[in-house]
């Protein structure tokens, strides 16, 4: 059985990230940074959880809710609580980690798998929210949510493509990166 060290492939000249991928990574970086801000200042009621001690941070959230009356944030439901807890405990730490990695222009398959997982997760959860907004005819709010639907979908497709391409590169790479291993 042939085993390929993917880390050696990425650190070698076999796999070079095309310029368009670097531009996409820059877009993803800004997406994650902006989504971190949106999560902390709009989506999550952090100031309410802290007892209103940071009321200056809740101004944007109050403005958004009073202006647009977003039913996803205003009307409680158990499934929404699950999504918000996911955002707090999974997405917020992930946004910080992935932003730092993308800023360093990391070419790491672990990063790509993580972004792929995030993309699928964010797309499916936002898809559910979009259906509720559609049912309530909240077109303006749907336009706010749309980038959080489209960009994660594109991320998932892009990262899946990168992983497939890297597997093909690893499979057809030089024999110096392939070692034989008996079963």
UniProtKB/Swiss-Prot annotation:
Domain of life: Eukaryota
Cytoplasmic compartment residues: 1-25, 103-110, 160-183
Organism: Schizosaccharomyces pombe (strain 972 / ATCC 24843) (Fission yeast)
Coiled-coil regions, chain positions: none
Record-annotated EXPERA domain positions: 24-156
Topological domains annotated Lumenal: 47-81, 132-138
Taxonomic lineage of the native organism: Eukaryota, Fungi, Dikarya, Ascomycota, Taphrinomycotina
GO cellular component, one term: endoplasmic reticulum membrane
Protein name per UniProt: Efficient mitochondria targeting-associated protein 19
Protein family membership: Belongs to the TMEM97/sigma-2 receptor family.
Topology class, membrane: Multi-pass membrane protein
Principal localisation: endoplasmic reticulum
Membrane-spanning segments: 26-46, 82-102, 111-131, 139-159
Name of the gene: ema19
InterPro entries the UniProt entry points to: EXPERA, Sigma-2_receptor-like, Sigma2_recept
Compartment(s) of residence: Endoplasmic reticulum membrane
One family name in Pfam for this protein: EBP
Alphabetical UniProt keywords: Endoplasmic reticulum, Membrane, Transmembrane, Transmembrane helix
Signal peptide from the UniProt entry: none
GO biological process: protein targeting to mitochondrion
Chain's role: Part of an import route for newly synthesized mitochondrial proteins termed the ER-SURF pathway (ER surface-mediated protein targeting), which retrieves mitochondrial precursor proteins from the ER surface and reroutes them to mitochondria for efficient mitochondrial import. Acts as a quality control factor in the ER, promoting the proteolytic degradation of nonproductive and extramitochondrial precursor proteins in the ER membrane thus removing them from the ER surface.
